[in-house]
A protein has these predicted regions:
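Alpha-helical scaffold domains
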Residues: 1-136
Length: 136
């Protein structure tokens, strides 16, 4: 059971009838597959449990998800990082910043703020970097 398999499951679960209203709700900022949150969560739960056993972040998976057009892939990446946040290191902060500012909208920022907050709580020396973010 690989994270790549999860991407295939997401594609198989797409529902074009639901995609339209989801796109409208997000003011047509992003295309959607039409997979609602509860269904999406059920799909990725088992993959994230398996991924935790590796005790390391798969940044290639995160980047692959972030580069895909449908918004659900960014949700998967952000929630993957939330599930794996205890394995983040302070060296991951620039990668997180890139996600926060790329394809940025309230929906993914609301997930990533918890991930960044957890990292900074574990590494208080990063607070200065967050202050710089707030000024940019």
């Amino acid at each position: 059971m690989s994270l790549a398999d999860l991407l295939g499951e997401l594609e198989a679960a797409k529902d074009p009838e639901k995609a339209g209203p989801m796109e409208a709700y997000m003011r047509y900022q992003f295309p959607f597959l039409g997979i609602a949150g509860p269904e999406r969560n059920a799909l990725y739960r088992k993959y994230f449990l398996s991924a935790k056993k590796t005790k390391m972040i798969d940044w290639d998976f995160v980047d692959t998800c972030w580069e895909k057009e449908p918004r659900e892939y960014q949700y998967v990446a952000a929630n993957y990082l939330k599930a794996m946040q205890s394995y983040l290191t302070k060296d991951d902060l620039p990668k997180l910043e890139r996600l926060v500012v790329t394809k940025s909208w309230w929906d993914t920022v609301d997930i990533l703020d918890r991930v960044v907050g957890s990292l900074v709580a574990n590494h208080p020396e990063l607070e200065e970097v967050l202050l710089k973010w707030s000024l940019s």
